[in-house]
Amino acid sequence: MNQADRALQASQARVYNFSAGPAVLPTEVLEQAREEMLSWQGSGMSVMEMSHRGREFESIMAQAFADLRELLAVPDNYEILFLQGGAIAENAIVPLNLMRRLSLDAPKADYVVTGTWSVKSQQEARKYGEVNIAASSEAERFHRIPDVSAWKLSDDAAYVHLCTNETIVGVEYQETPDIGQAHGRVVVADVSSHILSRPVDWNGYAVLYGGAQKNIGPAGLTIVIARKDLLGHAHPLCPSAFNWRLVAENGSMYNTPPTYAIYVAGLVFQWIKRQGGVEALETRNIVKAKMLYDFIDASGFYRNDIHPSCRSRMNVPFFLNDESRNEAFLAQARAQGLVQLKGHKSVGGMRASIYNAMPLEGVEALVDFMREFERTAA
């Protein structure tokens, strides 16, 4: 192999990407997107060039809707919306669509605060009405989720908001809180970083939303799944493009949708179906997370501070007991093809995001590296 061939091979090498988002995509999906880049299914056009109202893209959109509904077993009385703006925008869009549902004069919502993203959600919601913090684990540095029995929920709240997987601190609800439809409450959840990693109990949730760039596809697409009877309560000042009822009535084409992001998300949905569906991925995700947490817990060199009852399967933060070795850890990991392991700046340490598309081999490679780094650092 000559130098040019080696350079070409190196440029084509794939690393194990542990980024929290935008994040790893299935190799099969990337290969299919590459094959169809110049001409989607013989159309002579890239998906990026298509009119969103042309029959080619309409078929892509319809298939994506159908596959997502099938994968999550979304009931018929829920609407699936493809939007833009990410979960950050939904922090405003949710209260603009729901907070006046029970009272036009005194809009109110309950928020459960379990990490950085739910902090941001409640801060934004305060612009549109009263926010009651029903529970918070901030005093415990977000190392656990408050017990549901201690939540102080309001009788007059239009909805209860949760972030069911906190990407930064690494906590995840392992069970659906029993506060939803059976109790007459509307529960809204930000599921950005673990959507499609486990089945959904629709008795527990009225609205799910999330950015696609963590566990579905590229940045640019936001997914909202909302019970149909909740559409139509938007604030008069809610932008039309973010009014869920208008978006639903226009088939998520009130404005030009993020066409290529929807196309790639659709490829991911089909990939998940080939893997055996969400249930099969959940089993795989449990194995991956257990492997990494078990190694960390058995080590005297690394630690994870999250209570075992609510550790995230998707985002695993960990710390070196000797933080002076952090930069060496990251540099040596990168040399081994293990990238994007630096923890969020607000937390520090390391973080391995092991979403659906991260293969078991990637977690095995990370554990092997961590074991060797610990050995040589001793």
From Swiss-Prot:
According to the record, the segments passing through the membrane are none
Q: Does the keyword Cytoplasm apply?
A: yes
Amino-acid biosynthesis as a keyword of this entry, yes or no, is yes
Catalysed reactions, as listed in the record? O-phospho-L-serine + 2-oxoglutarate = 3-phosphooxypyruvate + L-glutamate; 4-(phosphooxy)-L-threonine + 2-oxoglutarate = (R)-3-hydroxy-2-oxo-4-phosphooxybutanoate + L-glutamate
Pfam families (alphabetical): Aminotran_5
Task: Briefly state the protein's biological role.
Answer: Catalyzes the reversible conversion of 3-phosphohydroxypyruvate to phosphoserine and of 3-hydroxy-2-oxo-4-phosphonooxybutanoate to phosphohydroxythreonine.
Q: What is this protein called?
A: Phosphoserine aminotransferase
- Organism of this sequence: Ralstonia nicotianae (strain ATCC BAA-1114 / GMI1000)
